[in-house]
Amino acid sequence: MVDQVNLATEQTSLLYPEVSRKKEELSVNKWTILPALWVGGFLSALDMTIVASLYPVIGSEFKLMNNASYIVTAYLITNTAFQPLYGRLSDIFGRRPTVVFANAAFTLGTFWCGISRSLPELCMARALAGIGGGGLGTMSSIISSDIVSLRERGTWQGITNIVWGIGGSLGGPLGGLIAQRWGWRTAFHFQVPMGILSTILVAWRVRVKPTVRNSNASLLSRIDYLGSFLLVTGITALVVTFNMGGDAFPWVSPVIITLLVSSVLILFAFYWVEKNIAVEPIAPVEILSQPTPLNVCLGNFFNAFCSFVIVYELPLFFETTLLMPSSEAGVRIFPYVISTSVGSLCSGLYMKKTGRYRNLVIAGFFFMLMGIVSFAVLTSFGHRTPLILISLCLAMTGCSYGMNLTSTLIAIISSLAPEEQAVATGLSYLFRATGSVIGISLSQTTTLSILMKQLASNLKDDPDKDDLIRRLRESISIIPNLPKDIQKLVIKSYATAFTWTFALVAIIAFAGFWCSLRIKQFYLHTSVDRS
């Protein structure tokens, strides 16, 4: 039997030398192409956590602390809106020009951030960086799918996620250190050389052709202009709605209602255009009409929603309820970051060995659900919450998130034809990014709303209640210095708010688990040529 296999391999090499040569080239190229892409991915993850640690400092310098969150929002809007465009654009213009554009836009935007003279200008610079940042992760996945077999794809994705995890872990401490010694502008400028290096590497190394057939039509005429405009506009309106709702404006205000209705109508118009007008749609309706791609995209939305709630809510819980300093609160999240990378890599190795992903998907979403429920229970203990149990739950949910990142990507790729992979990858990243933005916004709004009610109830006998609530909204640093009896009531109010927030997020986690049950198992090919 072994001789027959060897003979068949030899015959293939002799009769079809171009096929053998192509496989050898791909085997060599992936060791040079993928590390070149990882530089951009590392930089993107590093940048996001750097900015998360710097925006309060930047807002204070411009004396616009109440608007400092728009530094983050501007990046998230363009990052989310442009992610699905990269799939189709890379099919039209090619992989290399598209990934070079993404790196160049990110680098130019980051440089602009360092020389911005006002907060509005800085927000515009962050928006430009977001356009590029949206393509760094998406194009890395698309190109990986072009040159790596489905059986090995999970392993390489796991390594990619480790690189992103390292970048994300270093960003906060590194950004804070640089800003403290040399100023926040240096924190942006020191990224520029790495951005230039990443741009040069992908321009030099990435030589990958799209899997779709070339068209005789003009490249520019193939772009879905109307669909692109509607998608970017609709996503922008949606993200702005969930960022401003409950903060800048009440949820029932005319501004928020108008934005929400407008985003729904625009996205419905986008759906109609993609289904009836677009010749080469950026989001083919046929893909989302299939059970596995649809449930993968929805699952990515719910999974990212839960993940970002954990990352943003638990540090606040540590600071307000357990009275930890911000530096220690950030370190307490490390089990989540580390286990995310471990879960992603281990799931990739498992899929490479067994060729199966469905059980990983189900297990990942199940443990995410159990973790969210556990957080709802543990936060109810307030200042008596056992830290060891919190750390174990962080490790469990981080591992499950990493498993889901890798296994769902393989699930959607394996369920579609090669020419649909790039667009489908962009769609999955769109749902993931949208889930993260909405998760952050809704969880923070929910926590704040419940907290205000709890404070008003628990402090009803305090004559200075209104002034204390106002001060707590401005800064949580006053909690450790409050009188013990008042401090106990404030901590109790925060604990109740976090408990209810995680209880409501558990519904989202269950929706993700339900989607995972509807994802089917497809064959994972062992070669790049899936024919």
UniProtKB/Swiss-Prot annotation:
Topology of the protein relative to the lipid bilayer: Multi-pass membrane protein
One Gene Ontology cellular component: fungal-type vacuole membrane
| Listed GO biological process terms | asparagine transmembrane import into vacuole; basic amino acid transport; isoleucine transmembrane transport; L-lysine import into vacuole involved in cellular response to nitrogen starvation; transmembrane transport
Task: Specify the superkingdom.
Answer: Eukaryota
Its induction note reads: By nitrogen starvation.
Annotated keywords = Membrane, Stress response, Transmembrane, Transmembrane helix, Transport, Vacuole
Note the Gene3D superfamilies from the entry. MFS general substrate transporter like domains, Multidrug resistance protein D
Q: What are the recorded GO MF terms, alphabetically?
A: basic amino acid transmembrane transporter activity; L-asparagine transmembrane transporter activity; L-isoleucine transmembrane transporter activity; L-lysine transmembrane transporter activity
Lumenal face of the membrane:
52-225, 274-297, 382-385, 518-531
Q: For side Cytoplasmic, which residue ranges?
A: 1-30, 247-252, 319-360, 407-496
Q: Which residues cross the membrane?
A: 31-51, 226-246, 253-273, 298-318, 361-381, 386-406, 497-517
| Subcellular localization, as worded in the UniProt entry | Vacuole membrane
Principal place of residence: membrane
Disulfide bond: present as a keyword of the record? no
Q: Name one Pfam family in it.
A: MFS_1
Q: Which SUPFAM superfamilies match?
A: MFS general substrate transporter
What family classification does the UniProt entry report for this protein? Belongs to the major facilitator superfamily.
Q: What does this protein do?
A: Efflux transporter. Confers resistance to a variety of toxic compounds.
Q: What is this protein called?
A: Multidrug resistance protein fnx1
Species this chain originates from: Schizosaccharomyces pombe (strain 972 / ATCC 24843) (Fission yeast)
What phylogenetic lineage does the species belong to?
A: Eukaryota, Fungi, Dikarya, Ascomycota, Taphrinomycotina
Gene symbol here is: fnx1
